[in-house]
Amino acid sequence: HKSVKELLGENIKNSDFTEKTWYYKQEHGQEFEIEVADFKVSYKDNELKVDFGTSGYGRDNRKYKVNIENVEIVFDSSSIELFANDGSFTLSTRFYPNNHNVKISANNYVAQKLGKIEIREEN
């Protein structure tokens, strides 16, 4: 998403890693599954699923029927921002994982570290 372009860092080459703040991008409507501890977001057969596990503190899992052509996801230590189909479908949620062990099951994707947002006071 254009709001994170300036924050993009180096590529993450492994499908298993422990970054807290990172970016995921995939084109061509392919299926994917991303796990952060016991939180999971996945897409298969035109269904986007969000499974919170214990990271959601009792919140219900979510399912959306949507045909995803492209997706960008921003993860930080306790939130996810998902932009599908050039932003025509969006999803934001909080989650509270007990660790940041990430596992990606997907093909033809890009994962990148994200830099920190600096908030400065203007004089």
Predicted regions and their residues:
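Beta-rich accessory regions
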Residues: 1-123
